[in-house]
Amino acid sequence: MPKVQILNQQGENVGELELNEAIFGVDVNEHVVYEVVKNQLANKRQGTQSAKTRSEVRGGGRKPWRQKGTGRARQGSIRSPQWRGGGVVFAPKPRDYSYAVPKKVRRLAIKSVLTEKVNDNEMIVLDKLNLDAISTKKAVEVLKNIKADKKALVVIDKNDDTLYRSFRNIENVAICEAKLINVYDCLKYNSLVITTDAVKILEEVFQ
């Protein structure tokens, strides 16, 4: 079973935690991770891009000049794609880019990135994470004490308004509940800072 050190908010080693091998010790499947990240990014797309085809642009119903005799190239409409102000060829229209990925695939991807974080020593486990009051300064101090990377994802066990409002203002730092963890965020941030209670929730959810 993989083991990690447990730190307190001052960065001191206070114990060791045995991680569930079924979640933090799987064979990393890079292709599954790629597919899930691609799915997440596709689902985020607004899909509101829109442009007009030549049939939708106002005007252009009259032939601009006669077919022959002018010396100029023949034209049928001033709204043809080659004209300034003309329509767009195969103009994009609003569409839904989202699609579903099987639950088993999503779970395998999460397990793969969590395993990778443990293997690369990028997962920092805290015994607890508490702040007496909303303070970005103290939040920065905690991250500095535990030597987290400048790009860090903080994972807590439950919604805590004090922690959310303290960490959300730090550049390149995100905070989320364990049950809302996702593959893209795990890869986007170099350090994964997680509490022991949040680890238990992950082991319950993804077991």
UniProtKB/Swiss-Prot annotation:
Keywords linked to the UniProt accession: Ribonucleoprotein, Ribosomal protein, RNA-binding, rRNA-binding
Source species, domain of life: Bacteria
Biased composition (Basic residues): 60-71
Record bears the keyword Secreted: no
Biological process annotations from GO: translation
Secretion signal, residue range per the UniProt entry: none
Keyword Ion transport: no
Subunit structure: Part of the 50S ribosomal subunit.
Role noted for this protein: One of the primary rRNA binding proteins, this protein initially binds near the 5'-end of the 23S rRNA. It is important during the early stages of 50S assembly. It makes multiple contacts with different domains of the 23S rRNA in the assembled 50S subunit and ribosome. Forms part of the polypeptide exit tunnel.
Listed name of the protein: Large ribosomal subunit protein uL4
Gene name tied to this protein: rplD
